């Protein structure tokens, strides 16, 4: 006696629904692996549970991205909106430019030039000559800047030396220094004379700093 036909509808009991999902999911994954091996087919399966958890299978000989790209080409259906397609094209363009620049850089270093033809070698030679010329111009500009800087420093040094010589030769400076010396001498002499005239009782002794501060 065979099993009764199961009605296909949503299982209300959450526990039973989870058990059924696990069994059916494992069955689908098993069938996908079998057809992939037995028939050498490219198979990809993606399952999202009601909880949001994802399970997937893809044939070992391919990837999901390759299969989606193949599907896009064969079906003609848009899997991505124009904005994402433009971004993908821009990424590919930048990658190609980067690869091209890496090749040019190796050529400028003298690497991988055996495969270049005569015209490509001439272009490479022109690029090297232009680069060498620009480098020499930059070096000459730097040398000129250094010379100008050294000249300015030398002029400033000479100006300072001239001012120092003028200060030594100017008699006014000697007069000022002499007058200051005479003033200091008379000032100290006056103080000494004043202290000599003070009574002994009013003189501040060196060993009494407190009294000296008050005086």
Swiss-Prot record:
Its main location: nucleus. InterPro entries: MADS-box/MEF2_TF (IPR050142), MEF2-like_N (IPR033896), TF_Kbox (IPR002487), TF_MADSbox (IPR002100), TF_MADSbox_sf (IPR036879). Residues 3-57 form the MADS-box domain. SMART domains: MADS. Pfam families: K-box, SRF-TF. Keywords: Activator, Developmental protein, DNA-binding, Nucleus, Transcription, Transcription regulation. It is found in: Nucleus. Coiled coil: none annotated. GO terms for biological process: positive regulation of transcription by RNA polymerase II. Residues 84-170 form the K-box domain. SUPFAM superfamilies: SRF-like. One of its GO terms (molecular function) is RNA polymerase II transcription regulatory region sequence-specific DNA binding. It comes from the Eukaryota. GO terms for cellular component: nucleus. Transcription factor involved in the genetic control of flower development. Acts in conjunction with DEFICIENS (defA). Mutations in Glo cause transformation of petals into sepals and stamina into carpels. This is Floral homeotic protein GLOBOSA. The lineage of its organism: Eukaryota, Viridiplantae, Streptophyta, Embryophyta, Tracheophyta.
């Amino acid at each position: 006696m065979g099993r009764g036909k199961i009605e296909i509808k949503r299982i209300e009991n959450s526990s039973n629904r989870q058990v059924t999902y696990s069994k059916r999911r494992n069955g689908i994954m098993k069938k996908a692996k079998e057809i992939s091996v037995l028939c050498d087919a490219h198979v990809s399966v993606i399952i999202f549970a009601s909880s949001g958890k994802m399970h997937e299978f893809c044939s070992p000989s391919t990837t999901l991205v390759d299969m989606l790209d193949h599907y896009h080409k064969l079906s003609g259906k848009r899997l991505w909106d124009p904005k994402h397609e433009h971004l993908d094209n821009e990424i590919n363009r930048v990658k190609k430019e980067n690869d091209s620049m890496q090749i040019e850089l190796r050529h400028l270093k003298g690497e991988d030039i055996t495969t270049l033809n005569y015209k490509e070698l001439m272009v490479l030679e022109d690029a090297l000559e232009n680069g060498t010329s620009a480098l020499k111009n930059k070096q000459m500009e730097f040398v000129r800047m250094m010379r100008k800087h050294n000249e300015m420093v030398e002029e400033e040094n000479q100006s300072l030396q001239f001012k120092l010589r003028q200060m030594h030769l100017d008699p006014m400076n000697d007069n000022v220094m002499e007058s200051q010396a005479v003033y200091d001498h008379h000032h100290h002499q006056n103080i000494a004379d004043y202290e000599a005239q003070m009574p002994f009782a009013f003189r501040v002794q060196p060993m009494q700093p407190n009294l000296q501060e008050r005086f």
